[in-house]
């Protein structure tokens, strides 16, 4: 994601490191695309099958460069048989004091509004009408947007799936709400299931937590006839 935000304070440093690691000179967007392809080839050779994007929002207009790069990456993922995950909705680093004291990704993030729903549909439609959709999994952080994401996934099924309850929603109430949304607007059989942050070994129990909630819900439905 750092390569999709040229306005980010650390963008120049990140681009320099990408150029160094790939051996590709990055002087324009074509150079950036080439470097990203080289990096993708490396990850694919190491067995990578999933890519993940965490974005505050998805909209057109001022974000045309980012959209162009996302569309390009989506096509590359499809060509390589990789899954494209879109985690949408957080607003980052809200407290200047906390950011200055402990840095990024340290508790200063909050729930935001993802996007104009039409922008999300427009993005997926562009991918579909271009080279074709890769497999896409959508995750919303704002629970008020669950119906937007679940119905959008149905629009582009089976390539697009509605992902598991994420972050602040990864709770008893949040997981139940996500499952209800999935069953009401789509099919439970189309669930992508639970996922785990591989960087955090303490997150692995969430699979058991999810399984118990899912089994309790199914048992209640069966018991109720």
Region spans (language model):
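A conserved C-terminal secondary-structure "cap"
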Residues: 218, 224-225
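Active-site neighborhood of phospho(di)ester-bond hydrolases with catalytic His/Asp-centered motifs
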Residues: 163-164, 194-196
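Active-site beta-loop-alpha junctions enriched in small/polar residues
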Residues: 1-4, 54-58, 89-93, 141-143, ...
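N-terminal hydrophobic targeting/anchoring segments and the immediately downstream early-domain regions
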Residues: 1, 6-19
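C-terminal helical cap
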Residues: 141-144, 162-179, 225
